[in-house]
């Protein structure tokens, strides 16, 4: 019998070999095509604010308005709010609304329409989503991935980063935005640590 393992996130190949064939890991063949390792371009903007500031939305809009992008958020409410704010900027600029929401509470047909729009090579689109598009669903080739606030795990971060840079020679590009209220002046030390930033 043959066993095949595929992963975009495994870093310890020897451990993966032992997992695939515990008795004979030396018989596991690793196929890693030349050029498969993409360079990574990463940027992070941190805002001290009680809620998502307009500057974040403006920067996100400027970065994504002409690119195929997945914009990950950590809640459905955040997806809906950011989608509405980005589409308001499209209307302000007399552009077609190109930001589509995608999360588990949205009707299946609406989610599938967003996925189909992302696969359309002739129309610019960005999907603002929760973890629903973190893996598994083919949405075509992306120009970049954006993340609003920290992911809940390192694995989620790696999966989301891995959605971009799938063209030969293309870098993986991720823009991360974090927002955190400033600490009160008399707050204890541990409350002054910007955990969302970290």
Regions found by a protein language model. Give the residues of each.
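Alpha-helical scaffold elements adjacent to nucleotide-binding pockets in ATP/GTP-utilizing enzyme cores
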Residues: 15-20, 81-86, 113-117, 138-144, ...
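Conserved interdomain linker/interface between the two RecA-like ATPase lobes of SF2 helicase motors
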Residues: 2-80, 179-183, 195
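Conserved helicase ATPase core of P-loop NTP-dependent helicases/translocases
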Residues: 99-131
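Short, ordered loop/turn segments at secondary-structure junctions
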Residues: 8, 33-35, 104, 132, ...
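Conserved catalytic network of the ASCE P-loop NTPase/AAA+ motor domain
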Residues: 1, 22-25, 35-38, 61-65, ...
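Conserved segment of the helicase C-terminal RecA-like domain
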Residues: 2, 121-124, 148-198
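A short beta-strand element within the Helicase C-terminal
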Residues: 128, 133-150, 173-175
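Conserved helicase motor "Helicase C" RecA-like lobe of SF1/SF2 P-loop NTPases
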Residues: 77-98
């Amino acid at each position: 019998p043959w066993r095949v393992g595929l992963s975009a996130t495994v870093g310890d190949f020897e451990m993966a070999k032992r997992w695939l064939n515990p008795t004979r890991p030396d018989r596991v063949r690793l196929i890693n095509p030349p050029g498969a390792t993409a360079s990574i371009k990463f940027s992070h903007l941190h805002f001290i604010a009680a809620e998502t500031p307009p500057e974040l939305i403006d920067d996100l809009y400027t970065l994504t308005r002409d690119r195929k992008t997945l914009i990950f958020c950590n809640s459905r409410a955040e997806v809906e709010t950011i989608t509405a704010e980005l589409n308001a900027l499209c209307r302000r600029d007399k552009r077609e609304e190109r930001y589509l929401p995608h999360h588990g509470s949205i009707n299946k047909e609406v989610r599938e329409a967003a996925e189909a729009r992302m696969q359309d090579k002739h129309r610019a689109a960005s999907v603002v989503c929760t973890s629903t598009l973190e893996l598994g669903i083919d949405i075509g080739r992306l120009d970049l991935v954006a993340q609003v606030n920290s992911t809940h795990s390192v694995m989620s971060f790696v999966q989301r980063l891995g959605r971009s840079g799938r063209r030969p020679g293309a870098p993986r590009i991720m823009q991360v935005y974090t927002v955190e209220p400033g600490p009160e002046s008399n707050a204890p030390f541990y409350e002054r640590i910007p955990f969302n930033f970290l």
